[in-house]
């Protein structure tokens, strides 16, 4: 009798209700009580959408981030966030974004460091640890949500981050060993599990995705120590792994003293039979059989083909779930009435994935005949996609076949190129620039919406966007920036904007997923071969350049980032789709150069998040990813300067690979980690120009001039000053003009002082 459960559900709401409630609260337009009501309503609705499952997750809902929630539960908020006046919620948001709803800009504090959640586009707030970190249980959030769910008659399964992964995700600021804190942490976990059991929890899910990464003997010992100590607690423990294969941690995971183990059967299909054989006969095996990270329908008949023998073997010990939390999937496909009907029929969002789960369970428990119609409909959809003429393009296939290694090479090495570029551009020392986007005001968003609805003519839309470009260029000239951008008012998203102009992409209206906090993205759907029918950005950049004598950067998103921030077809290797994207971007780069654009930025913000979780797999990924970037970037003259930008990543371990990209200038996010990236330059001499981000745009805080000068002075100890640029650490799209202007004034003032 297969049991169904879920590891987590999207928290933002089908219409992004959480996003808007948070922003209203931060903006003083909503009270803390009103925010709490919205959150409770969303939780109730999400539980109702999961009510057909045998176990429903509790604690997966968060106002900002589940890792930050765990820090709160463990009493591990940074002192700087918790020591000021205000509510617990104010302290929570200070840790997340540097400012509570009731804090003034002058009283803001440093936001917590934010980085990518494993190899996804979700960001978490890094737990801050020192040798003196003290943990203290604060279970109210979890207990409240558990009580709410039980009142609805639901079989609730609390979800928490396991103790070893929590420490693994953290970072120490004093060179101490994170694992030294484990013995101090485990009693708090024991108290939490006991409290959840007292509140009626039969099962508790402990997420330990660190088990799918490379672990040394100390971390493996930590798992044994932790779970042998926690096994005495009353609730049954379901240890959840996801995003990859267990590999050399498989035996460890199977032998830990827990009541059940969840593995990702989508990412690690070859391990299913091994785990089933290894797992002791008293333990539950939960299989992630529906892809929680993509939007394609599952092939249910194929899945049943390998599940049915396991069901015979395991019986009641078999649980079924999505591969990971559905946090990474849009909420509900049923609202996508404008989506092409053929493509819509190929898709499943979070709600539909749970339907698939229940069809599989019924087929196992009652026989395939009990879901004959559902399986037949599913097979029709699978066959439709497999046989569709819309998926392949012979012209694209021919272009890919003609690619040669020479396409990835510039004419000359960097020293010769940079000499020509400096002569052409004539920029001052420590040149200042921004990363690309400027604030997307209400007026910009409204114009884009009206244009999409047909309420605004194309000419009127172009005129309004041009007016915004004028505003942006004039503002940058007034600020004294050296290299300008057009501000990207016409772009809804740095990936979707390009996808909308490429053959092989489809788009949703409501396919939002959370990136961090209130920030949501709507990944386009890469369903077929990629072709660029016409130029995508040239006219906007040409217009911006006509307004100023200063250089204006052409702004493109790179092939690897477009790939990693899309929902990607799963019927061919990702590297094949990436190469198709690279050829399309290469055409755009060449058109920009022909239009007289002297600096072209190709953002690869998501390069690192595509890295496999196991270091032994990195070389293969980096080879095709960097090759794709080089093919996109290197079809230009030596005097054309190629920039790239990367964000929210740690690069020290791939700095040599980044150097192989051979961009003339790279700008990177370093402000939240206090230039930690520069540690890489102790042992590696980065050969090209670099702009280490000097202030954090994800926080509303205004940077301090002396802090910027100190950061750049530190950078100049590692990199020759003549190769340093000064810039924010990311685009300014999500900020307000009243935040952007003083921040950039400070940045330019710092640059001028450094020059003097």
UniProtKB/Swiss-Prot annotation:
Database matches in SUPFAM superfamilies: UROD/MetE-like
Enzyme class: transferase
Keyword Zinc included in the entry's annotation: yes
Cofactor binding note from Swiss-Prot or TrEMBL: Binds 1 zinc ion per subunit.
Positions contributing to L-homocysteine binding: 435-437, 488, 603
Keyword Transferase: yes
Segments passing through the bilayer: none
Substrates-to-products reaction catalysed: 5-methyltetrahydropteroyltri-L-glutamate + L-homocysteine = tetrahydropteroyltri-L-glutamate + L-methionine
Cofactor: Zn(2+)
Functional pathway: Amino-acid biosynthesis; L-methionine biosynthesis via de novo pathway; L-methionine from L-homocysteine (MetE route): step 1/1
Top-level taxon: Bacteria
Job of this protein: Catalyzes the transfer of a methyl group from 5-methyltetrahydrofolate to homocysteine resulting in methionine formation.
Protein name: 5-methyltetrahydropteroyltriglutamate--homocysteine methyltransferase
């Amino acid at each position: 009798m297969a049991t169904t459960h879920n590891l987590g559900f999207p928290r933002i709401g089908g219409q992004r209700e959480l996003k808007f409630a948070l922003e209203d609260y931060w903006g003083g337009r909503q009270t803390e009580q009103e925010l709490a009501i919205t959150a409770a309503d969303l939780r109730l609705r999400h539980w109702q959408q999961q009510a057909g499952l045998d176990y429903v997750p509790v604690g997966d809902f968060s106002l900002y981030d589940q890792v930050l929630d765990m820090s709160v539960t463990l009493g591990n908020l940074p002192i700087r966030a918790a020591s000021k006046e205000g509510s617990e919620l104010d302290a929570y948001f200070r840790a997340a974004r540097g400012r509570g709803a009731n804090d003034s800009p002058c009283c803001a504090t440093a936001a917590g460091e934010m980085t990518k959640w494993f190899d996804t586009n979700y960001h978490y707030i890094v737990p801050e640890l020192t040798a003196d970190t003290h943990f203290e249980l604060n279970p109210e959030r979890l207990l409240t949500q558990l009580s709410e769910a039980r009142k609805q008659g639901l079989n609730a399964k609390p979800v928490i981050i396991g103790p070893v992964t929590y420490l693994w995700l953290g970072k120490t600021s004093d060179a101490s060993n994170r694992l030294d804190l484990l013995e101090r942490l485990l009693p708090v976990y024991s108290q939490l599990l006991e409290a959840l059991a007292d509140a009626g929890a039969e099962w508790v899910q402990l997420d330990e995705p660190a088990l799918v990464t490379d672990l040394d003997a100390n971390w493996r010992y930590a798992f044994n120590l932790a779970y042998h100590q926690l096994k005495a607690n009353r609730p049954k423990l379901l240890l959840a792994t996801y995003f990859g294969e267990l590999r050399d941690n498989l035996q460890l995971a199977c032998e830990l003293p827990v009541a059940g183990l969840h593995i990702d059967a989508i990412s690690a299909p070859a391990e299913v039979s091994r785990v089933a054989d290894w797992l002791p006969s008293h333990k539950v095996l939960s299989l992630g059989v529906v892809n929680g990270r993509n939007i394609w329908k599952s092939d249910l008949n194929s899945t049943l083909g390998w599940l049915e023998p396991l069901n015979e073997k395991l019986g009641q010990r078999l649980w079924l779930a999505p591969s990971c939390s559905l946090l990474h999937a849009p909420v509900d496909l049923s609202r996508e009435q404008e989506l092409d009907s053929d493509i819509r029929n190929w898709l499943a969002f979070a709600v539909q994935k749970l339907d698939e789960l229940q069809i599989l369970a019924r087929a196992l428990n009652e026989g395939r005949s009990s879901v004959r119609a559902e399986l037949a409909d599913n097979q029709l959809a699978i066959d439709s996609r497999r046989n569709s003429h819309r998926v392949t393009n012979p012209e694209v296939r021919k272009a890919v076949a003609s690619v040669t290694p020479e396409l990835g090479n510039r004419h000359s090495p960097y020293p010769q190129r940079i000499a020509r570029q400096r002569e052409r551009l004539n920029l001052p020392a420590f040149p200042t620039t921004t990363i690309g986007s400027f604030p997307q005001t209400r007026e910009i968003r409204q114009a884009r919406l009206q244009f999409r609805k047909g309420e605004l003519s194309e000419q009127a839309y172009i005129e309004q966007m041009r007016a915004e470009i004028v505003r942006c260029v004039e503002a940058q000239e007034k600020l004294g920036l050296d290299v300008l951008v057009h501000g990207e008012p016409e772009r809804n998203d740095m990936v979707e904007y390009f996808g909308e102009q490429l053959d092989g992409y489809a788009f949703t209206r409501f396919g939002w997923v959370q990136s961090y906090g209130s920030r949501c993205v709507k990944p386009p759907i890469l369903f077929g071969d990629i072709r660029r029918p016409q130029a995508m950005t040239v006219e906007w950049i040409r217009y911006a350049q006509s307004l100023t004598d200063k250089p204006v950067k052409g702004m493109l998103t790179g092939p690897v980032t477009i790939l990693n921030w899309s929902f990607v077809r799963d019927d061919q290797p990702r590297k094949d789709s990436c190469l198709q994207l690279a050829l399309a971007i290469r055409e755009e780069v060449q058109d920009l150069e022909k239009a007289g654009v002297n600096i072209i930025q190709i953002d690869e913000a998501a390069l690192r998040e595509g890295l496999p979780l196991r270091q032994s797999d990195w070389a293969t990924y980096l080879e095709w990813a960097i090759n794709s970037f080089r093919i996109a970037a290197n079809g230009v003259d030596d005097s054309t300067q190629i920039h790239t930008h990367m964000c929210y990543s740690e690069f020290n371990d791939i700095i040599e690979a980044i150097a192989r990209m051979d961009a003339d200038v790279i700008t990177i996010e370093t402000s939240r980690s206090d230039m930690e990236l520069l540690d890489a330059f102790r042992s590696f001499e980065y050969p090209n120009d670099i702009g280490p981000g000097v202030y954090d745009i994800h926080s509303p805080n205004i940077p301090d001039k002396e802090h910027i000068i100190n950061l750049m002075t530190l950078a100049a100890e590692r990199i020759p000053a003549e190769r340093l640029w000064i810039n924010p650490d990311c685009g300014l799209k999500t900020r307000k003009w009243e935040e952007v202007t003083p921040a950039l004034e400070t940045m330019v003032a710092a640059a001028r002082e450094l020059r003097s």
